[in-house]
A protein has these predicted regions:
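Iron-sulfur (Fe-S) cluster-binding segments and ferredoxin-like electron-carrier domains
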Residues: 22-48, 73-93, 305-316, 321-323, ...
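Short cysteine clusters
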Residues: 14-20, 24, 64-70, 74, ...
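Ferredoxin-type iron-sulfur electron-transfer modules and their immediate structural context
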Residues: 1-61
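Conserved beta-strand elements of the Class I
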Residues: 138-139, 259, 329-332
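Alpha-helix N-cap/helix-start capping motif
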Residues: 18, 68, 81, 102, ...
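Iron-sulfur-cluster electron-transfer modules
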Residues: 41-222, 226
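C-terminal amphipathic alpha-helical segment
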Residues: 236-283
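Cofactor-cradling patches in redox/metallo enzymes
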Residues: 144-232, 267-363
Length: 363
């Protein structure tokens, strides 16, 4: 396996370092040393030195969520997410992907999403149909909401409808490339998906990214990969806050204490921590978990549940425990993947709400 000098420098700097050992959400959930960034770097270094085969470490390579908690706490600037993505890309080029990943990649290429699904649920189709007319604003729902959590996509649309917003939702939404980028990195096929998506999105002045996963890719990764995006991309929390502050969106504040689960894509990657909090504070009494904002702890997602569902439940259960530890009874999420993961691990003591649920007055 050939990796760049920069990648190898990061690998060799991380393989014997314990600085981020305590913060990896998957390492903490499994209790396995192999799940930590340090162990992943050690495995990669052994492959580059010929002591292990690439096949030997690939399951471990796909135990990383890419959440960047390790990068956040590293005072010396090393990046385990970067070298993990580099190895995935190289494994794809060498035909060394695990079968369960190969299947998801094939789904992405054939259907535009890792789940291999082609049509959203009927209720969502009806909601999309109400906004098929062309406008200068596009609501980009993303694969998780369209195919795995359509009821949440309907609620996202309902929030904008409550504000009287004029927007379009596509019956056939192009893949943003976020899932391909996570699975295999900056391959030609990934960039082709992104270019095709950009060609559609550039037909609008404003694109509202409902899913932080897509928001991060559209606003950061496209530029890194040389994909031209001329439209304004705004996250759903930021757009909803604009509607609230302009008086177009109305909410009712309840005496309900809640904590907010920051999606790492918003807090760490895009620096958006105040917009969701302003929205939540208008609807409920907001307090904080110990680790929040840029220091947030990832709570799981839908994509990784395709190959490690038990670990995802453990990751989510630990985050719920974090909320319980500060006496919280309600967690509000702004990411559909984390919402689904937390819901799957929901306990009687802690209620899980999406940001849309809160705005619409749901419990």
């Amino acid at each position: 396996m050939k990796l760049s000098e920069k990648v190898n420098q990061h690998v060799d700097s991380c393989r014997f370092c314990w600085m981020c050992h305590h913060i990896c959400p998957i390492g903490n959930a499994t209790g396995h040393e192999r799940s930590t960034p340090r162990a992943r770097a050690l495995g990669i270094s052994l492959v580059t030195r010929g002591a292990l085969r690439l096949d030997d470490i690939m399951d471990n390579i796909y135990e990383c969520a890419g959440c960047g908690a390790c990068v956040q706490v590293c005072v010396t600037g090393w990046d385990p997410v970067m070298f993990t993505k580099a190895v995935r890309e190289q494994a794809a080029l060498e035909g060394k992907l695990p079968e369960y990943i190969r299947k998801l990649v094939a789904n992405c290429l054939s259907s535009g999403n890792a789940y291999g699904m082609t049509e959203p649920a009927g209720e969502l189709q009806a909601a999309i149909g109400r906004h098929s007319a062309g406008t200068d604003t596009l609501l980009f729902l993303g694969a998780d909401a369209r195919y795995k959590m359509p009821e949440q996509a309907v609620k996202t649309i309902a929030v904008l409808e409550r504000a009287g917003a004029d927007f379009t939702v596509l019956a056939e939404e192009p893949a943003s490339g976020a899932q391909m980028d996570y699975l295999v990195g900056a391959l030609r096929e990934t960039k082709a998906q992104m270019q095709a998506c950009a060609a559609v999105l550039n037909g609008y002045k404003t694109v509202i990214a409902a899913d932080p996963t897509d928001a991060k890719v559209l606003r950061r990764t496209y530029a890194e990969y040389g994909v031209d995006l001329s439209c304004r991309v705004v996250t759903f929390p930021a757009y909803a806050l604009e509607l609230l502050q302009s008086g177009r969106l109305t909410v009712r504040k309840r005496e309900m204490p809640v904590v907010y689960q920051d999606p790492f894509q918003l807090s760490r990657d895009l620096g958006e921590t105040e917009e969701p909090r302003a929205l939540i504070s208008a609807c409920a009494d907001l307090s904080e978990m110990l680790l929040h904002g840029e220091e947030t702890v990832w709570a799981g997602n839908l994509l990784m549940a395709e190959w490690m569902p038990e670990v995802m439940r453990a990751v989510s259960a630990r985050r719920i425990f974090n909320a319980e530890s500060v006496g919280a009874k309600t967690i509000v999420t702004a990411c559909v993947g984390e919402y689904a993961a937390l819901k799957a691990a929901e306990t009687d003591g802690v209620n899980i709400l999406s940001l849309e649920d809160l705005i619409l007055g749901g419990n």
